[in-house]
Amino acid sequence: MGPDSTLALGEGAVRGRLELGVCLRGGRSVASRQFHEGALRVLRPHYLDESGQVGYVMVNPGGAYLGADLFLIDVTVENNAALLLTTQSATKVYRTPGSFAEQRMSVRLGEGSRLELMPDQLIAYREASYRQNSRISLHPTSSLIMAEVITPGWSPDGASFKYQEVRLRNEIWIDDENGAKLLALDNLLIRPPLGDVTGMGFMEGFSHLGSLVVVDPRVNQGLADELDLIARDFDAYTGMSLTATIAGSTGLVLRSLSNSTEELNNLLGACAGVLRERWYGQAPLNLRKY
């Protein structure tokens, strides 16, 4: 089905759907299930090193999200498998008059598995509304590193905040033999028309926002302090928080404000790079997209 088609789903039309399952086979992580329909797909898998971690690049052939577009992404990383999931380019949200573009993502991580979710930046243009809802379920022994950068798109008068709304909601659950427990509800809502988001107490005069979420049994206050020190080397305003510990697993949320996409990407990359090297003996990510 081509990128201009729409797919029926209950309350509305689905612009694109992607399902990806990854398992461990012969010492390497490989796709166990792969399905795409409409305006989403993945490129051929790649391996950046000898760790066995598989990398996939998500592609939206249409290049942008428009009003009433709905994209569905379903990812499963099976026991002991490792997945790096990124995008080919920035996610661009254009005018969405009378509606909003939406992405819904469901992620399940099995025992001893790991996922690095490292998309390119989200760019919200003039009069754009965008909602992103993610539900992530982890085994207590699995590991998640998830980064996100939000930037305002160009507008004719040069002002930064001309989009209508950006709403990012992450539900993170720990699921074991005793059932699922909510570890974190990370809800970010920016509505420029309803107030001065550039002022003190919200964006602190900055225009770009970066977020890093880490969930792992090795997350603790010492790690949070270390990442905070790393963040101070960048031209950004950064805060850090820890979740409660559930079944031995803890979450960390880092938020950074800056006026530069590159600065935020470098900051988040530096923090993720420390974890890759320490936990898995891997080099910092170099996805060579540019």
From Swiss-Prot:
Pfam family, one: UreD
Protein localization: Cytoplasm
Record keywords: Chaperone, Cytoplasm, Nickel insertion
Gene Ontology cellular-component terms listed: cytoplasm
GO molecular function, one term: nickel cation binding
InterPro entries in alphabetical order: UreD
Chief location of this protein within or outside the cell: cytoplasm
UniProt xrefs under HAMAP family: UreD
UniProt record similarity statement: Belongs to the UreD family.
Summary of the function given for this chain in its UniProt record: Required for maturation of urease via the functional incorporation of the urease nickel metallocenter.
UniProt subunit comment: UreD, UreF and UreG form a complex that acts as a GTP-hydrolysis-dependent molecular chaperone, activating the urease apoprotein by helping to assemble the nickel containing metallocenter of UreC. The UreE protein probably delivers the nickel.
Protein name as annotated: Urease accessory protein UreD
Species of origin: Paenarthrobacter aurescens (strain TC1)
